[in-house]
């Protein structure tokens, strides 16, 4: 049995759906009339249109992304059973997408470090040295970050030896 509160919620949902459909139809017709108004041109790629909300290639040397790399690798290390921490060697490729926060897809060259996970100290991956005799790897990662919530989720999409 529906209560008045349930009925009110249902009416709001229906109204929201109708408004969303009307706006979607308006956006489709606006895009059909003038597709260039639906594109954004930013940064170095000003001659190439970028789809709003779509994946955008980023510069692997971008300071904002490089500052995130140690935190990202710490999350990767939490998921690994290896005795040693992995450390970043080089960010090879990165793209981003604005969602509720920012999603990054990246290829990161990593190596096993001399820093052991068993130590109780907080590890600074930028100060760890590479453990010789172990192959470097390229990890493909997807990172979802919402800094205002202090939230970061890292998913390992793939790993291959260099």
UniProtKB/Swiss-Prot annotation:
Check the record and name the SMART domains matching this protein: CY
Cite the record's tissue specificity text.
Answer: Expressed in the cuticle of L3 and L4 larvae, female adult, and in the eggshell of developing microfilariae.
Which UniProt keyword terms apply here? Disulfide bond, Protease inhibitor, Signal, Thiol protease inhibitor
Q: Where is this region: Disordered?
A: 30-54
What are the annotated disulfide bridges?
115-128
Motif, Secondary area of contact: chain positions: 97-101
Give the UniProt entry's GO cellular component terms: cytoplasm; extracellular space; vesicle
Q: Where is the composition biased (Basic and acidic residues)?
A: 36-47
Site positions (Reactive site) are 53
SUPFAM superfamilies in the record? Cystatin/monellin (SSF54403)
The residues forming the signal peptide are: 1-32
One GO term in the molecular function aspect is: cysteine-type endopeptidase inhibitor activity
PANTHER family per UniProt: CYSTATIN
* Function, in words: Cysteine protease inhibitor which inhibits members of the peptidase C1 family. In the human host, inhibits CTSL/cathepsin L and CTSS/cathepsin S and to a lesser extent CTSB/cathepsin B which may cause defects in antigen processing and thereby impair antigen-driven T cell proliferation.
Which named protein is this? Onchocystatin
